[in-house]
């Protein structure tokens, strides 16, 4: 590389949607510093691994990726490990992987340029602070997006302290971004071509703020204000906690046309005994009541969930109760995982840790039921007309892929249309993970 060539960077994000958002913000920040993006880490001058610590497998994958960055001549790029693994393991990362130059937690990544500068001077630059001031004010303003959809972090951190979860320790206490900042960022995204925004938070429905008139509002109020923005066609939010599904938010699902009929509401288990051990602070009955009320407000809503199988002490009867809540809820989709023992969490030292073989067998049974429900939900859409936002090209000539209001991928052959267009379609076929459709008419 010539000395006057701009330095290149590659950001690889693991895990949740908020990590995707954080990765995009880091990329924007590096772009403002004169770096240009590289397609992958093989030839980049700087590689940022934006990590996830929710499960052991995701955390260990980071070290595998670090090892693969070593080049044939023995050199490595400047390597920065960001995100929740960085926060949880800190200097241990640099000890295990000496090629790592920068370790930065999720609340300090706005300092990434100065940490890189320190690394280039030969220092091991580590910043795990959780500063009181908001990192968001230090980030560059949002620019053109190139895609019709975008994430917008409105809330970070969690105060729930579920006994299996590292998020309160890696992301910190719950904070809500100011209303005015969120409206400004949303407007910048829409000006850059975004038509759908997903509001993000570890506990997104705990967001609170004050509107332009100084009135206290919750997430439902923010959604109603965003819905007034011309050019913004769709609004989603994730991830929610059952205890923070307020009356106002439930009502908004029935009243705000731009709020998509989709709700991701994790329950994790169907046994009150296990929910108590998890410190979920809700019961099976209260969860099902929320689902009932949401469906009363928006009958066509798609419900998504999260499940953990094999939590310490889970009996066969407890697991059977999880299958029961799945049958009662009728999920459109759901994510299910084996319990992952995370150091530092209360569940890691609980008695009656479940054997791996038992967890595997239970996970297979749960996923079979969830897959059956997902297929049934998809098949129920066949013959319906709906509106798609076209997001990317398909594999076939003239084929585009969009998202339905219920978050399914929909394949449609629509010559003359482009990514970012909206189109009315009729659903013609349903698979386990996607739908097929025929176009009816384009919408400007």
UniProtKB/Swiss-Prot annotation:
This is tRNA-2-methylthio-N(6)-dimethylallyladenosine synthase. Belongs to the methylthiotransferase family. MiaB subfamily. Residues 7-121 form the MTTase N-terminal domain. Monomer. Signal peptide: none annotated. Its cofactor is [4Fe-4S] cluster. The keyword Iron applies. It is found in: Cytoplasm. It comes from Sphingopyxis alaskensis (strain DSM 13593 / LMG 18877 / RB2256) (Sphingomonas alaskensis). Residues 144-376 form the Radical SAM core domain. Residues 379-441 form the TRAM domain. Keywords: 4Fe-4S, Cytoplasm, Iron, Iron-sulfur, Metal-binding, S-adenosyl-L-methionine, Transferase, tRNA processing. Its EC number is 2.8.4.3. SMART domains: Elp3. Binds 2 [4Fe-4S] clusters. One cluster is coordinated with 3 cysteines and an exchangeable S-adenosyl-L-methionine. It comes from the Bacteria. Catalyzes the methylthiolation of N6-(dimethylallyl)adenosine (i(6)A), leading to the formation of 2-methylthio-N6-(dimethylallyl)adenosine (ms(2)i(6)A) at position 37 in tRNAs that read codons beginning with uridine. GO terms for molecular function: 4 iron, 4 sulfur cluster binding; metal ion binding; N6-isopentenyladenosine methylthiotransferase activity.
């Amino acid at each position: 590389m010539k000395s006057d060539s701009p330095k290149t960077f590659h950001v690889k994000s693991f895990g949740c949607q908020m990590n995707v958002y954080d990765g995009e913000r880091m990329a924007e920040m590096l772009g403002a510093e004169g770096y240009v993006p590289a397609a992958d880490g093989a030839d980049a001058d700087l590689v940022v691994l934006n990590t996830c610590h929710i499960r052991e497998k995701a955390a260990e994958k980071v070290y595998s990726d670090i090892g693969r960055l070593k080049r044939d001549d023995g050199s490595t790029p400047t390597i920065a490990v960001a995100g929740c693994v960085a926060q949880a393991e800190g200097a241990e990362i640099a000890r295990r992987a000496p090629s790592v130059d920068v370790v930065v937690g999720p609340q300090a990544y706005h300092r990434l340029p100065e940490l890189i500068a320190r690394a280039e001077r030969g220092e091991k630059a580590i910043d795990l602070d959780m500063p009181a001031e908001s990192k968001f004010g230090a980030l560059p303003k949002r620019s053109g997006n190139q895609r019709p959809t975008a994430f917008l972090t409105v809330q970070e951190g969690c105060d729930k302290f579920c006994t299996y979860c590292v998020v309160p320790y890696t992301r910190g206490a719950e904070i809500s971004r100011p209303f005015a900042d969120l409206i400004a960022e949303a407007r910048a995204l829409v000006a850059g071509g975004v038509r759908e925004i997903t509001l993000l938070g570890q506990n997104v429905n705990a967001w609170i703020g004050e509107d332009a008139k100084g009135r206290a509002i919750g997430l439902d109020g923010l959604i109603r204000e965003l819905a007034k923005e011309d050019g913004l066609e769709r609004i989603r939010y994730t991830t929610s906690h059952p205890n923070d599904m307020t009356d106002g938010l439930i009502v908004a699902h029935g009243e705000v046309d731009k709020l998509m009929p989709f709700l991701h509401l994790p329950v994790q288990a169907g046994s009150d005994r296990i929910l108590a051990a998890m410190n979920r602070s809700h019961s099976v009955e209260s969860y099902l009541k929320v689902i009932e009320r949401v469906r009363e407000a928006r009958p066509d809503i798609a419900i998504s969930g999260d499940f953990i199988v094999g939590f310490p002490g889970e009996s066969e009867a407890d697991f059977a109760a999880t299958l029961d809540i799945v049958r009662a809820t009728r999920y459109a989709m759901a994510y299910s995982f084996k319990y992952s023992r995370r150091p530092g969490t209360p569940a890691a030292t609980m008695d009656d840790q479940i054997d791996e073989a038992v967890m595997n067998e239970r996970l297979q049974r749960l996923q079979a039921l969830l897959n059956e429900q997902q297929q049934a939900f998809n098949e129920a859409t066949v013959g319906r007309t709906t509106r798609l936002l076209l997001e990317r090209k398909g594999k076939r000539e003239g084929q585009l892929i969009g998202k339905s209001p219920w978050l399914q991928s929909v394949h449609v052959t629509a010559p003359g249309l482009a990514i970012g267009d909206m189109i009315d379609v009729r659903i013609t076929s349903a698979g386990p993970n996607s739908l097929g459709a025929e176009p009816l008419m384009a919408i400007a």
